[in-house]
Amino acid sequence: MYLVKSAGSPIYRTLRTLTTSNLMAATIASAKDPLTGPRYEREPNVLRKKLASVVPGTVNLQVLGSGANGAPAAVYLFTDQARYLFNCGEGTQRLAHEHKTRLSRLEQIFLTQNTWASCGGLPGLTLTIQDAGVRDIGLHGPPHLGSMLQSMRRFVVLKNLQVRPNDCSEGACFEDSILKVDSLPLINSEDPTKSVINYICQLKPRAGALNLVKCVEQGVPPGPLLGQLKNGNDITLPDGKVVRSVDVTEASETALSFVFLDVPSENYLPALLTHGKRLKKLGEEKLTEVALVVHFTPYHISSRQVYKDFVVESFSSEAQHIYLSSPLNQFSGYAAAHRIQHQLHQLAPQVFPLLGEQLSCQSQTLSLNLKKTKLDEADSEDKANAKANETEEQGVVAMTNYHLRPRKGLDRTLESKLTPEEYVKETHAVPGFLELLAKFKEEYSFPDNSADSYPKIIFLGTGSCIPNKTRNVSSILIRTAIDAYVLLDCGEGTYGQIVRLYGHEKGQLILRQLQAIYVSHLHADHHIGLIGLLRERRQLKPRADPLILLAPRQIEPWLEFYNRQIETVEDAYTLVGNGELLASPLSGEQVERLGITSISTCLVRHCPNSFGISLTLAAKHNSEPVKITYSGDTMPCQDLIDLGRDSTVLIHEATMEDDLEEEARLKTHSTVSQAIQQGRNMNARHTILTHFSQRYAKCPRLPSDEDMQRVAIAFDNMEVTIEDLQHYHKLYPALFAMYAEYTEELEQRAVKRELKQERKRKLAET
C-alpha cells in the first residue's frame, strides 16, 4: 500500500482528478518502494530481512524439468521474495540456465527421495549457487542428506555456502511467512529403513490490498485513515460518512494448498493409502482447498488402478494434476541443443545428426483438469464429467506454469518449444553463409558412414566446469567395436545426452553395450553423471554384465557411502584404479571384449590424482592399429606426450583462448594453441579440441596463425570417424561464417582485454 503524506500532496491532488484507468498507473509510477531500490539490490540479505514477514501477492509454480528423455523431474516455486525447488535431478541447473530461471535467489530445496533420480543435480547446483553468492540454503527431505553432502566433500567443496539439512521423516518440515510445508513420510513395506517424503504445501492467507481508486471515490483523505482501512477497520469521515474497510479493499486470498506425491514403487503404496483421509479433509476445507497435485510418481505406479482410485478419492474434482515422468512428456526442454544441432546439421548431417528424442508432446485424451486455464471458469457440465477424467493427463514440458496467486490456473504460454525452421533461417540470414555452404557442398561431401561404423567418437559433453545450454560438461563416448562402447569421463547429465541423441530404444542398446567408464579425475564436472548411468544400466532387463570402472581410487569412499546408505549400484561395476595402469597397462582377455588391445594411463598436470589415458584398439586404419589418447584436464604435459606418441587421434582439453594463457596456468588448464602443440609434439595424426570454457558456448576463439588442417573443434552431439577427421577442416569457412557475429564478439572482448592490460602496464611503468 502507498500512503500519501499530506492532503496538499500534488500526487493526491492528481489522484482526485485522474480517470480511474490512469489513476493506478500514476500511483504505481509515483510510489518509491524502499524495498526495491538500488541500495537493496546490492544488499540481498537486507532485502530478505525486510521482506521476511510479507505475504506475497504473486506465487507461481513452474515445471523446470518434465522427466522426459533423461531430463530431471523438477519444479520451481517462485514468489515475490523467495524461491523453492522441489527435487533436483541431473540436468536441473542446465534447464534453469537455459530458461533464465535465476537460482541465485533460491532459499529452500525439498527432496522426495535421497536417491540419485531426485538429488543427482544437487552437487553441481550447490557449487553454482555458491559462486552466485548464495550463503545458506535449507535442504529438506529423507534421512542421510547431511551425511551424503559430507561424503561428497572431496569433490563438492562448499567454503562459502552453508547447507542446512532437515530430516522430514518425522512429519514436521518447514514454515516461513510465505508457506507452510508438512511432510507425508512413506515407509517401504519391505524395508522399513527406506522412506520417501511427500509434501503438503499451504500458502499463508493474504489480506486484501487497499484499493486506492475506491478510497478516492469514497472521499477518504490521505493520512492515518488509509492505514486503518488497510488494517480492516471501518472509519468515519469528518462529514459523518462511514466507510467500511470491506468496501475499499480487494478480496482476501485463502490459504491455498498444493501437494507433491512421489511413490517410487509398489512397496510404498500401503503407506500412501493411509494418508487419503487427511488429504480429502484438507481439500474439503474452502480455506485450504487443494488446487494442484504434482505427481513425481513414475508412470508404472501412477498408471495402476489403486493409485488412480486414491487420487479420485483424496482430491476434489476441481484439483488440477501435473504428471511428471509421464510417457506423454516427450520433450526434454533442452531447446538450445536442438537449435545448434539443426544449424550444424546443414554442414554435415552424418557428423551432426539431428537429435533422436521425440520433438513434440502428442496429446491423447485431455482431462478437464489440464484443459482449463482457470479453475473458476469450469462450467457445471464439465465439472460433472471431471470425476471420470481426473487421473488422465496430457504432456507437460519445461516452463509449463501454474499460477497459484493471484489467480489459479495452468499457463502454457511460456512452454519450451522447438522451431526448426526458425533455427535454419537464422543461419540463412547471415551474409555469405549460403554461398560458402553451397561451395562446400559442391567441392566435397563427407563419406556416407553407416550407423554401424567404428571406431567412432561421439561427444556428449564439450564444456568445462558447469553445464551450458549448448555445451554439457565432459563426456566422450567411443565406439570401439561393433557391439562395444567405452565412455571417457561422465559429467552430470551424460545418460540424458545419450537418450536425447539416439532416442530411448537405441540409447538403451548403447547402455547395454557400454563396457567401460573412465574417470580422469574427481572434479565434479567429470564424474557426477556416473551414479545415474550405473543406476540406469542396472535396471536393464535382462541385467547387463558389470562394466569396468577406471577411476582414481579416491572415488571409493563416495561409492561405498552411496552403496551402503542410499541404494546398491556396486554390482554394476568392477573398479580398477587409474594408478594401477601407470606401470602395467590393462590388456588381455579383460579388455579384448571391448575391442581394445591395451589401456595405459599417465599422471597429468592438474589437481592431485589427475590422469590421461591412451586406448589402443583392435580396429585398424590404413593397416595400423587405431590409438586414441585423451588428456582429461591438464596443462601442457610431457608425460601425456610420451603416452600418446603417434596417436591416431588426440582428444585434448582447450579450456582457454591464447590471450588467457596466464589464467589457464593458474587454473592448470591448456589454451587452444597449447593443445594443438601437444598434438604436434606427440605426432598425433588428428587433434580434437574439447572442454571449452563456457564463455565459448557456440564456438571457441581460434588463433589466426594456426594450421587447422589436422585440428577439429568438438561440439555436443557430434560423432566422427577417422575418415571424417581427415576432411573436418573443410567445414571451417562455412562454420565461422555461420557464427560470424558470435566470433566477432569474442574478438571485441579480446581487444578490450588487451587495452585493459596495456593501461595496467603503463600505470606500472609510471
Swiss-Prot record:
Induction: By juvenile hormone (JH).
Keywords of this entry: Developmental protein, Endonuclease, Hydrolase, Metal-binding, Mitochondrion, Nuclease, Nucleus, Transit peptide, tRNA processing, Zinc
Cited CDD domains: RNaseZ_ELAC1_ELAC2-C-term-like_MBL-fold
GO cellular component, as recorded: cytosol; mitochondrial nucleoid; mitochondrion; nucleus
Enzyme Commission code(s) on record: 3.1.26.11
Catalytic activity: Endonucleolytic cleavage of RNA, removing extra 3' nucleotides from tRNA precursor, generating 3' termini of tRNAs. A 3'-hydroxy group is left at the tRNA terminus and a 5'-phosphoryl group is left at the trailer molecule
GO biological process terms, semicolon-separated: germ cell proliferation; mitochondrial polycistronic RNA processing; mitochondrial tRNA 3'-end processing; positive regulation of cell growth; positive regulation of translation; regulation of cell growth; tRNA 3'-end processing; tRNA splicing, via endonucleolytic cleavage and ligation
Top EC class of this enzyme: hydrolase
SUPFAM superfamilies found in the cross-reference section: Metallo-hydrolase/oxidoreductase
Cellular localization per UniProt: Nucleus; Mitochondrion
Database matches in PANTHER family: ZINC PHOSPHODIESTERASE ELAC PROTEIN 2
Function comment: Zinc phosphodiesterase, which displays some tRNA 3'-processing endonuclease activity of nuclear and mitochondrial pre-tRNA. Probably involved in tRNA maturation, by removing a 3'-trailer from precursor tRNA. May participate in tRNA processing in the developing embryo.
Record's miscellaneous remark: The dual subcellular location may be due to some alternative splicing and/or initiation that changes the initiator methionine.
Family label: Belongs to the RNase Z family.
Protein name: Ribonuclease Z, mitochondrial
